[in-house]
Amino acid sequence: MEEEICAALAAKGITHPFPIQALTLPVALKGQDIIGQAKTGTGKTLGFGIPLLMDTLGPGEEGWDEDPAAGSPQGLVVLPTRELAKQVAEELSTAAANRTVRIVQVYGGRAYEPQIEALEKGAEVVVGTPGRLIDLMDRRVLDLTHVTTVVLDEADEMLDLGFLPDVEKILARTRTDRQTMLFSATMPGAVVSLARRYMTQPTHIRAQDPGDEGMTVKTVQQVVYRTHALNKVEVLSRILQARGRGRTIIFARTKRTAARVAEDLGARGFATGALHGDLGQGAREQALRAFRNGKVDVLVATETWQIGRASCRERV
C-alpha cells in the first residue's frame, strides 16, 4: 500500500485490516474483478476503496501531467442511497487525506448546481446514486469514458429499490477494460446475472461462514418480543427505559408508522427523531446529525434508509 494512504489511516487508528479487507486487497490490487459477499459493518469500504485510490492519480501527482484524461473521473462508486454515498465518500476522503485526489458526491435531493460545479472543477473519484449519475450523464456534465475502476456497493439493495436497469446504463457508458468490484450481502439471481454480463472472470470472496445465512454479523444479539399492535409503543417505551441502553434505532415498515412512533415516543419524554421519505433531504441530514451528536438518542426510520449503515459506528 502507498505510504500516504497508510499514514492517513494510521492517523485514524486504523492499522490492521478486517477479514474482508485482508481477503479483498491482494486480489483487487492485481486489477482483477471481484464479487464480494459481505455483510454491513465488516469494513468492506476500505477493501475496495484502497485499490481504487491506488489506481487513481490526483493533480500534481507523478504521472498526472502526462495523463490525457487528467481531471476526468477515474474511479466510480455506485450506491443505492444518499446516506450510503455520503458515508463512503467520507471514508474514501479519510484514506486519501494525504493525496490530492478529488472525491465528489452526487445524489438526488440536492441542487444540481453545486454538484455540476464540483465536477467541472475536476473529479478523480465520483461517488453517487444511480438516478443522479444518469441525470448528470444525460446533461453531458459527467463523462465516465475514462473510468478504470467501478464499484457497485450494496448491489442487492439496488435490486430491491429497482436500480439495476440504471446500473446497467451506467456500466454501458464506461470502458470495457475497467476493473469492476461488486459487493452484496446476498446474491439474488438478478445480481448474479448482472455480474456475469459485466464482469470478467471475477474472483468470488465470501467474508462469512458458508453456513451463516443471516443478514447481520454474529456480534449482533437478536431478541423477539411478541406483542399486540396496540401495545407496541408501550413495549418500546419499557425497552427504552433499560439502563445503559445507549443510542437506539427503531425501524418501521412505513413512513406513516415511523412518524407516528417517533411522535408517540416523544410525547412520553424520549429524545426522539424521525427519518423517512416524506422528509426533505435537509431534514433527514439534520435528524442524522442530531443522532450522531447525541441531541436525540432514539431514531425511528423506515427500513429503506438503512440508517445503521450511515449514521455512526459507535455503540447503537
Predicted regions and their residues:
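Conserved helicase RecA-like core
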Residues: 1-315
